[in-house]
Design a protein with these regions (language model features):
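Vicinal oxygen chelate
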Residues: 1-4, 90-129
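N-terminal beta-strand motif that seeds the catalytic metal site of vicinal oxygen chelate
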Residues: 1-20, 73-76
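A generic structural micro-feature
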Residues: 4, 36, 67-70
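Core segments of cupin and vicinal oxygen chelate
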Residues: 15-57
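Short, conserved charged micro-motifs
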Residues: 20-21, 83-88
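Short, charged/polar, Gly/Pro-enriched secondary-structure boundary elements
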Residues: 49-53, 61, 120-123
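A short, acidic/glycine-rich surface segment
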Residues: 58-64, 102
Length: 129
């Protein structure tokens, strides 16, 4: 079978339990810039990848919470090219009281990273490339 021809991931979409809380976290707290907003949806770029955040639908369970151990998404990792940026980001997460691991070294690849959770407990990493 021939390999799929793609320049990379175009976008990811995450469902949130609270649209306004998610918007405050990603836009106001983390500083991403909204590039498109429609009812119950906003999109920002993380590097060259669009990240779409959707609010809950009528069928979204009211007490639902992300679980990285279910089949599906485990976490999202953003690339970091400067160790000073990694340290600044860690300090920002701490100042915002965002749950995080502190800067660690990945045992598999030997790269530094910090893992954190958004308000719906979706796992993210800021990872040295």
């Amino acid at each position: 079978m021939e390999k799929i021809n793609t320049p990379g991931v175009h976008h990811i979409t995450l469902r949130t339990s609270d649209y306004q809380r998610a918007k405050q976290f990603y836009i106001d707290d983390l500083g991403f810039e909204v590039i498109l907003e429609k009812p119950n949806l906003f999109i920002f770029f993380a590097g060259g990848t669009a990240v779409a955040i959707r609010g809950p639908e009528a069928s979204t369970p009211s007490n639902d919470q992300f679980n990285p151990f279910r089949v599906g998404l485990d976490h999202v990792a953003l690339g970091c090219t400067d160790e000073e940026d990694l340290e600044k980001f860690a300090a920002k997460l701490n100042s915002l009281q965002v749950e995080n691991t502190g800067i660690k070294v990945d045992e598999t690849l030997g790269k530094k990273y910090i893992a954190f959770k958004d308000p719906d407990r979706i796992s993210w990493e800021y990872y040295m490339v």
